[in-house]
Amino acid sequence: MYDSKKLELKWQEIWDKEGIFEPKKDYNLQKKYILSMFPYPSGRIHMGHVRNYTIGDAISRYYRMQGYNVLQPIGFDSFGMPAENAAIKHKIHPKKWTYDNIDYMTKELFRLGFSFSKNRILATSDPIYTKFEQEFFIKMFEKGLIYRKNAVVNWCEQDQTVLANEQVEDGKCWRCGNEVVQKEMPGYYLKITSYADELLSCLKDLQNHWPSQVITMQENWIGKSFGLEFDFKFDDESSKKLGGVKSFKVFTTRPDTIYGMSYAALAPEHAVVKAVLEKNLVSKETADKIKKILNQSPRERQANDKDGAFLNLFAIHPLSGKKIPVWMANFVLAEYGGGAVMAVPAHDERDFEFAHKFNLPIIQSIGAKNGENVKLPYIESGILVDSAEFSGLENEDAKMKIIEKFEKEKIGKRVTNYKLRDWGISRQRYWGAPIPMIKCPKCGLVPEKIKNLPVTLPDDIKITGKGNPLDKHPTWKHCTCPKCGAEAERETDTLDTFFDSSWYFARFTSDENMWQEKGIDEKSANYWMNVDQYIGGIEHAILHLLYARFFQKVLRDLGYLRDSEPFANLLTQGMVLKDGAKMSKSKGNVVDPDEIIEKYGADTARLFILFAAPPQKELEWNDSAVEGAYKFLNRLYERSQNVQKTREIPKIDQSSLNKAEKYARLKVYEALQKSSEVYEKTFAFNTLIAACMEALNALNAQENRQILTEGYFIILNLLDPIVPHIACELSENLFGRANFTPIKILPEVFEKDEIRLAVTVNGKKRAEIEVASDLSQSEILKIAKEQVLKWLENKKIIKEIYIKNKLVNLVVK
């Protein structure tokens, strides 16, 4: 049994001393930037981390072997609520808790032999990182990409902080699981909507480079749609009730159904609904119902049954002139299309469900093209019916003609809408990057001076879990205005942690010599960016990956970066499961990587992780399979004793080999042939490992020491990115070197002793023959004719065609 602990420590010390994983500063070299999503420093790494970083490390080591200049950095997404929760629970400062965890996790990661650049390790809570992040914030603010406004937000009472829509899951906070309520608050917003079109259009450049599922999820989240926007006018009585409000805007993607409208529906947050409540235009019972729905998050409303209330208001149909009742409905989103819809229950499932519940009219305006009766709601394409001059038109044609009518009469227009909303980035917590803004009673909102950055957090803080700790600090928020010098107050909100993780990939590119000088060194960034291979979980498809794409475009426009997309290729790895469920302490099914390393070694953990399943699939933990991986490495180590020690790899005469020797050599070269596709495209490491195992078995089944020696040299080369410690040890012992280089594929190894050929007569297959591969063409033709004699009787052969190693075709007449 080999001593994995001793062997692995030896090679980790060698790699560290030689600094071989630090990227070279020669920007003329071909480069590869391989990045796995950085972890939150929760205290210990888990098997999900091991899988993520083993995949990235295997790819990185492969490209170094191919002669590329490789950047593979690591850092920590180190701001966030868990540190504050730990401060309350364990009476420890968030900073100490965070950096203690970073120290421990860094040691764990390097115990696994990951080839990270040690000179570029960062934490987003480092003051130097905060400095440049605040500089970017100020530049975005000055460009109008960040603004402050009052808005109804998702509020978590437990964490006492604002949540982005994406952070609300089934009406609950994504972190603590508590119910989320709606609350109006001031906050800072990133104008991601100003890049909506580019974020959408650039997705086409990522086709075949990103998983299609991620692209679809982002397309749906951005939610671009075309349609008609018009002012829906109140009747005189309703306008009078509302104090002179004349109309409200409506957006619809289905103007072809406008003659089927039977009611209008407003979002609970709509200004008209607010006016109805303020002016007591509905009963107390109805008002209470509206207020109850108002306090539900948008996602909670979507999950509930359709509900609403009549507002005692009517609007006038813009084309027919009919009076249309105006309702509040829980399924209408305040953030989309102005928060108002024209409801057509005959041709929309949600409208139909609502109308059915409240006994509202259902008016059909589209029928089937074949004239047959249809079941409502009918949402397919068809022919307009009972739609004035548009009756008889196909609905797609009618859409444009109805919009043209609205535009001609100047009562509406064609518009583009997005589901994507601006990103709220204010958080009411201590452990986050301070927002570098100052509230001056004279000047208003003023950014801090760049020379005064970073604005850092006070260490003397009391964290109770209630309210904003910075707001309660006795001195920290008091300052002078950078503009006029008057007494002022700092912004006490901190940045959403997704802000921190939206540019870290660009920070990693900065040469360590420029680390303190620039947040992003343009020369280095233009060489390294974009990331050639990004690796992380699909759960980040919308949040992190969309925000990172947005930041890339903003930083490009600010002159820091050149590329429009941050990640050229994306691999989303599956979760690690045990007993069919995601590993968690509550389920008691956690496997501690430290215990696996202690018992079997890092190489065994790496081998199992890459062999157990393709990276894109879920991986089921299997103790016996871990044991099997360990046994394979022991077998590889023990049988290396039969290998000839040499600095020159044997040159082998293929023609002199027997069948077992040829087979063993073939299996080795088949694995070699597979390797480039695995490491560069498919990442199906399990298939490469299986091929190496098969090759090793074949090598051990024959007795030619030269074949064994050549085979070991190649197999160690192929396995080095996966099990680098044992591969380096054996290569040094056997071949006097541990620096692996590409190996040429020898075509003669794949030449078979016998070949199988199809025999066709006039193009029709009549037989198959197996012949020696060195047989002449005339001999092959002779054998082929003998096999198809009955199809040649009384026929004249006018042409004989031989396609080497494939077929013989006899043309007869």
From Swiss-Prot:
PROSITE patterns named among the record's database cross-references: AA_TRNA_LIGASE_I
Keyword field contains Lyase: no
Reaction equations catalysed: tRNA(Leu) + L-leucine + ATP = L-leucyl-tRNA(Leu) + AMP + diphosphate
Gene Ontology cellular-component terms listed: cytosol
Compartments where located: Cytoplasm
Extent of motif 'KMSKS' region: 582-586
Keyword rRNA-binding belongs to the record: no
Entry-linked SUPFAM superfamilies: Anticodon-binding domain of a subclass of class I aminoacyl-tRNA synthetases (SSF47323), Nucleotidylyl transferase (SSF52374), ValRS/IleRS/LeuRS editing domain (SSF50677)
Residues spanned by motif 'HIGH' region: 39-49
Xref: InterPro entries: aa-tRNA-synth_I_CS, Leu-tRNA-ligase, Leu_tRNA-synth_edit, M/V/L/I-tRNA-synth_anticd-bd, Methionyl/Leucyl_tRNA_Synth, Rossmann-like_a/b/a_fold, tRNAsynth_Ia_anticodon-bd, Val/Leu/Ile-tRNA-synth_edit
Gene Ontology molecular function: aminoacyl-tRNA deacylase activity; ATP binding; leucine-tRNA ligase activity
Record's keyword terms, sorted: Aminoacyl-tRNA synthetase, ATP-binding, Cytoplasm, Ligase, Nucleotide-binding, Protein biosynthesis
Disulfide bonds: none
Principal place of residence: cytoplasm
GO biological process, one term: leucyl-tRNA aminoacylation
Entry EC number(s): 6.1.1.4
Residue numbers binding ATP: 585
Family: Belongs to the class-I aminoacyl-tRNA synthetase family.
Cited PANTHER family: LEUCINE--TRNA LIGASE, MITOCHONDRIAL, LEUCYL-TRNA SYNTHETASE
This protein's name: Leucine--tRNA ligase
